[in-house]
Structure formats: structure tokens, C-alpha cells
């Protein structure tokens, strides 16, 4: 989608493919071996890393482990019995660990088995793989087994020391190394040949998981990646919203993490320019930012210093060239997100200032610019960026980069400044600033990311006085498709200190239009902001939500609408709950038969409402009292 200036070129008023990142135009981005000075093992040396004869996994053995895993999954919930089964199965695994790990089906089963494994059996399997560690780490199936083993650490490190001692006493001939020693041994081997592991397509996954485990933090952006056999739907994650899961690790892990951090500094050029290796550095920055911020700052300085020392571009800082590069720009995005506020402001003044508009219009560089906006926390820096970028908002939208505008609006929300100015600029960009009556249409325009003339299919000559907003025309038209970025834009605006104009536009929507918004996968989240924003008063919230009266059954029978109705119900007073229940009760049978509606009926206690009204009211009053008591406790 896009918006354009008021001109004959109306195509520019509509964004085209706005949220996708255009980074696949020039191949993989990874230089061919031998041309970049990147160390590669000779073919003979690589052959030496593999076992002389790769062990074969017989169909009988594969069938046995498949049946054993199925039995383990349906085993009784009793921890001791399930653990005993896992021990017995994994004891059989030890002798065929390499064969299982390097077989596609066997690898998938071994990954699941490790999820059930107690501490010592996992150490035994790991020890069985260790003589061929490099081969397994760089094998397309074996790599996922190593990742799965590493990802068991948060679970296994929580076990009390007494349990470990009991295991050592019970198991004869236990592994010679503890789990901590095995992890440190893997880290030492990776450290000895760091460039090789980081540059290998499969080995880099092990490095990235190892960095997280050593730091005691699992990144959400990486948790969907280990299992190569999973569907693409399962693997999709949001890199922008990276919420780490922390767990306690031994001090030796952090010491080894520092060693790996130093390895990046030795060959910083490779990790900036090589696509596969760059992923490892990006993960390292996130982990170090959480656990060792000083080392993170050193790495950031090394990246910026290296890029700043390259040949200058024609239009200013040499860093600008790398902001437009597929590989290095992704690394710079991560650098921007972890930089300290003072360093971020210095980076802006040294490299970004005066270039924001050209970066915003570039198909690649607009993404690092979005991360810069995401990282801003000081009013001073936001003022500098806002002053430079705000005049170009409409042109940026016309280029199909609404993410930049959404990031700027989010920065205004977060910092708490320039909110009125950015809203006025949005009105102008979407051609609903003048006449003022058009402002009532801002919500449909923002949601669809369409200019006023495009949304309402008007033919206006260039230079003509904009027509007044026609309420009849607006109410008769169905709401257009809600975009993800349009929904985010509305959510940020509703969290502004004064969201009155946006709420007025929401109140102008008809019941069917508001229903369409609630039933939309993206639009339903706008209601989350309406219900939770501290800037929206109870009166304003009620004015918007009362329009949904008569639409409750349709909401309840919708995947996303039912979620919205549940949220409305949770915050509704007793009187509003009676109205909702009465309307739903008229279609009780329809709700019970609907896959989403029957959950709503149960949440509302609709059967009790229809048959025992007094008991229902007493139950709802009790729930309301508990909610008020909990709210007062939380406020205190």
C-alpha cells in the first residue's frame, strides 16, 4: 500500500506490497569459497572429519525406536515411571547414537527422546557423539540433535544437586563427564575453529544455540529455527519482538561466552560481510546485550569502526553503503537495537543525520532506519529525527514503506513527544486533514493504508478544493481489508495521551463496519488497544463499544471476533453483561453448535443465565467483587 501526493499519479496513493522486505534480488549474498579470504577446509581434510564408514540404521532398529517413542508418549504421567522408560530407551540409543543422529527419521525421533531424557542418559548420548562432534554439527540432520541437546539445559540445570548425586550412585559406569563439562568441551572445539563453524550452513545453528545456552538466555527469534523437519508455519517467528527466556548458568559458561565474543573481534570483517557468519554475530549481540553489556558495546564499536573505515560513499558516510547492503544492513539493525542511548545519538549525528529521507525511500535501508526509530528513548534524539523525517511522510508512504511511518508513530508514543504533530501529518498524508469533516474517516483510511480518494473511489482533479466528507456514503460502504501495519498504526495512536480524534472516527463506524474490524486477524487487535489504553476513558470506550450491540452473535461465532467479545466481557460491568447475555441467549442453539460460539457461551455461563437468572446474577456479582479487589491490590 502507499499514499502519494495529490496529483494525477493516483497509483502512488496506494501502497504496494508494503510489509515485505526486498532482499532477495541478488542471490544468497554469500561469497563463493576462496574469493574472500574466508578459511575453508580442503576437501581431503573435510573427508577426514567424517567417520570412515557412516553407520547404517537398519529398518528393524528404526522401527524399534519408533515404537519405543510412541510408548513413551502415552506412558503414565507418573514422573518416575516415565523417567525409567526414557532411561531404558536412551540406553539402547547410546550404541547407535551416530546412526540415529545422521538419519532423517532417526534424528527427528532422537530430538523428541532428548526432550524426555533425564540428566545422565543425555550426557551418555552426548558423550557417544563427541568423537564425531564436528561431523555431527555440520550434518543436515545431526545439527538438530546437538541443538536439541543444548536446549535441554534450562530444564536439566534446574534439577537439585541431590537428584544428580542419586543418579550417580544408581547408574554404574556413568559418563566420565558432567553436562557442564560437555557443554564447555563443545564450546572449546567451536572456539578452536570458530570461522569454520560460523561459516558452515548447519554448523552456524550450533554456534547460535551455544551462544544462547552459555549466556543463559533463549531468544524467541531463534527458538523456531532448530527443527529442520518442522513446517514453515511452525518456524515463523517475529525477529522484531525478541523476548528472551532467562535461566541460571554456571559462571564458567559466562567465561566461555567471553572467549567466543573475543573470537568475533579477531575476524570482524568476515562476520560483517559473510551472510551465514553474520547470523552468529547478530545472536551474539542479543545475548551479550542481556548478560555482558560491556562486551556487547565492544562488538558494536568494532562493527561501526570497521564500516566507517571503508571507502566513503558519494553522498556522505561510508556506513550508508552498508545500510543498503542485504547482509550488513541486517547486522546494523541489530547493532542499532542494542546500542546505548549515548552511542546511538552519536551514531545518528555521525552517519544518519541529513540522510533519513533517502534511507526511508530505499528498499533495503528503510529497515535499519526503522530499527533506529525503535531504539530511540530520548526526546532530544526524537526531535532531531522527527524534524528531518516528518516532511517526507507522504512520499515514504508512496514508496511503499509504511513501516517507517509506523515506527515513527511508535517512537512518538514511547517517548511521549510530537504526538499532535505526527497525527496532523498523518491526516495530511492520507488526505483527510481538510476539510475537517474528513477526519471522521481516518480510522478506515489508516486501517487500509489508503488515501481518502482511493478508499472512497473519488475522481478529484489536481488543484481542486477537496470535497466535504459524505457521512451517508461512508456508512453505506463496507470496511475494506485491514492491514497489519494499519492495525499497528491505530494501536499506537490509541495509546497517545489524547486519542480523541481516532476514537471519534471509531465511534462513527456502523455496527457492521465495527464487526468487520473485530473479525479481522489484524483489526481485532485494535480492540485490545481500546480496552487497555490508559488514555481511553470509560465513557469513550463505552461510546465505541455500544455500536457493537446487535452484533454479539456474529462476534461470538468468529475466530477473532470471539476473542474480542471475551475481552469485552472481562471488563464489562454487570449491566453490560446482562445485555450481552440476553442477546446471545436468543441464539443459544446456534452458539452451542458453533466451534467458537460454544466457548463464548460457556464463558458467559449462558445456560445458567437462561435457566437460573438469579444464580447467574449472584455469580457475576461475586466475580465483579473479586476483580475490583484484585485491581485495588495491584494499584497499591
UniProtKB/Swiss-Prot annotation:
Composition skew (Low complexity), residue ranges: 25-41
Region of interest called Disordered, as start-end residue ranges on this chain: 1-41, 222-242
Record keywords: Phosphoprotein, Repeat, RNA-binding
Disulfide bond residue pairs: none
Molecular function via GO: RNA binding
Polar residues bias spans: 228-237
Family of the protein in this entry: Belongs to the NOP9 family.
UniProt-recorded name of the protein: Nucleolar protein 9
InterPro entries, per the entry: ARM-like, ARM-type_fold, NOP9, Pumilio_RNA-bd_rpt
Organism lineage: Eukaryota, Metazoa, Chordata, Craniata, Vertebrata
Xref: SMART domains: Pumilio
Residues recorded as bearing Phosphoserine in the entry: 7
UniProt xrefs under Gene3D superfamilies: Leucine-rich Repeat Variant (1.25.10.10)
Pumilio repeat intervals: 92-123, 189-223, 313-348, 351-386, 509-544, 547-581
Amino acid at each position: 500500500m502507499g499514499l502519494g501526493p495529490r496529483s494525477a499519479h493516483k497509483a502512488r496513493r496506494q501502497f504496494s506490497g508494503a510489509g515485505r522486505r526486498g532482499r532477495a534480488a541478488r542471490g544468497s549474498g554469500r561469497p563463493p569459497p576462496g574469493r574472500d579470504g574466508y578459511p575453508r577446509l580442503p576437501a581431503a581434510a573435510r573427508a577426514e572429519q567424517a567417520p570412515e564408514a557412516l553407520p547404517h540404521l537398519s529398518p528393524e532398529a528404526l522401527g524399534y525406536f519408533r515404537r519405543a517413542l510412541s510408548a513413551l508418549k502415552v506412558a503414565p504421567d507418573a514422573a518416575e515411571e516415565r523417567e525409567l522408560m526414557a532411561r531404558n530407551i536412551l540406553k539402547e540409543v547410546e550404541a547407535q547414537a551416530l546412526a540415529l543422529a545422521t538419519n532423517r527419521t532417526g534424528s527427528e525421533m532422537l530430538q523428541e527422546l532428548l526432550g524426555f531424557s533425564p540428566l545422565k542418559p543425555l550426557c551418555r548420548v552426548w558423550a557417544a557423539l563427541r568423537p564425531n562432534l564436528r561431523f555431527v554439527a555440520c550434518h543436515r540432520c545431526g545439527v538438530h540433535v546437538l541443538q536439541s541437546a543444548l536446549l535441554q539445559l534450562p530444564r536439566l540445570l534446574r534439577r537439585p544437586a541431590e537428584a544428580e548425586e542419586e543418579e550417580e550412585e544408581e547408574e554404574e559406569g556413568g559418563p566420565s563427564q558432567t553436562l557442564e563439562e560437555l557443554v564447555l568441551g563443545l564450546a572449546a572445539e567451536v572456539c578452536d575453529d570458530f570461522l569454520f563453524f560460523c561459516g558452515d550452513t548447519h554448523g552456524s545453528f550450533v554456534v547460535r544455540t551455544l551462544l544462547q545456552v552459555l549466556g543463559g538466555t533463549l531468544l524467541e527469534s531463534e527458538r523456531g529455527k532448530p527443527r529442520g523437519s518442522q513446517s514453515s508455519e511452525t518456524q515463523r517467528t517475529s525477529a522484531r519482538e525478541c523476548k528472551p527466556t532467562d535461566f541460571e548458568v554456571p559462571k564458567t559458561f559466562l567465561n566461555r561466552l567471553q572467549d567466543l565474543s573475543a573470537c568475533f573481534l579477531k575476524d570482524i570483517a568476515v562476520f560483517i560481510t559473510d551472510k551465514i557468519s553474520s547470523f552468529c554475530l547478530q545472536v551474539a549481540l542479543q545475548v551479550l546485550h542481556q548478560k555482558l553489556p560491556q562486551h556487547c558495546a565492544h562488538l558494536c564499536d568494532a562493527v561501526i569502526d570497521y564500516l566507517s573505515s571503508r571507502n566513503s560513499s558519494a553522498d556522505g558516510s561510508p556506513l550508508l553503503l552498508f545500510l543498503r547492503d542485504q547482509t550488513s544492513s541486517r547486522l546494523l539493525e541489530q547493532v542499532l537495537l542494542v546500542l546505548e542511548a549515548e552511542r546511538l545519538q552519536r551514531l545518528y549525528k555521525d552517519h544518519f543525520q541529513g540522510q533519513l529521507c533517502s534511507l526511508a525511500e530505499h528498499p533495503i535501508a528503510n529497515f535499519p532506519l526503522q530499527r533506529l526509530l525503535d531504539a530511540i528513548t530520548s526526546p532530544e534524539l526524537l526531535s532531531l529525527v522527527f524534524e528531518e523525517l516528518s516532511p517526507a511522510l507522504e512520499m515514504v508512504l508512496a514508496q511503499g514503506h509504511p513501516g517507517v511511518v509506523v515506527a515513527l508513530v511508535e517512537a512518538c508514543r514511547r517517548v511521549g513527544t510530537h504526538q499532535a504533530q505526527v497525527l496532523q501529518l498523518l491526516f495530511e498524508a492520507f488526505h483527510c486533514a481538510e476539510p475537517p469533516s474528513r477526519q471522521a474517516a481516518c480510522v478506515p483510511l489508516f486501517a487500509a493504508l489508503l488515501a481518502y480518494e482511493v478508499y472512497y473511489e473519488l475522481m478529484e482533479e489536481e488543484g481542486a478544493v477537496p470535497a466535504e466528507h459524505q457521512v451517508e456514503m461512508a456508512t453505506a460502504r463496507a470496511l475494506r481489508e485491514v492491514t497489519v501495519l494499519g492495525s499497528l498504526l491505530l494501536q499506537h495512536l490509541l495509546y497517545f495521551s489524547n486519542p480523541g480524534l481516532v476514537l471519534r472516527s471509531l465511534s462513527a463506524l456502523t455496527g457492521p463496519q465495527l464487526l468487520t474490524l473485530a473479525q479481522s486477524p489484524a483489526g481485532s487487535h485494535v480492540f485490545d488497544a481500546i480496552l487497555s489504553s490508559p488514555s481511553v476513558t470509560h465513557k469513550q470506550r463505552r461510546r465505541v463499544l455500544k455500536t457493537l450491540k446487535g452484533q454479539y452473535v456474529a462476534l461470538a461465532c468468529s475466530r477473532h471476533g470471539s476473542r474480542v467479545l471475551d475481552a469485552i466481557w472481562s471488563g464489562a460491568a454487570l449491566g453490560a453483561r446482562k445485555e450481552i447475555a440476553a442477546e446471545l441467549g436468543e441464539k443459544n442453539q446456534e452458539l452451542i453448535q458453533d466451534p467458537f460460539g460454544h466457548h463464548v457461551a460457556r464463558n458467559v455461563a449462558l445456560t445458567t443465565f437462561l435457566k437460573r437468572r438469579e444464580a447467574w446474577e449472584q455469580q457475576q456479582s461475586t466475580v465483579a467483587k473479586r476483580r475490583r479487589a484484585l485491581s485495588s491490590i495491584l494499584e497499591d
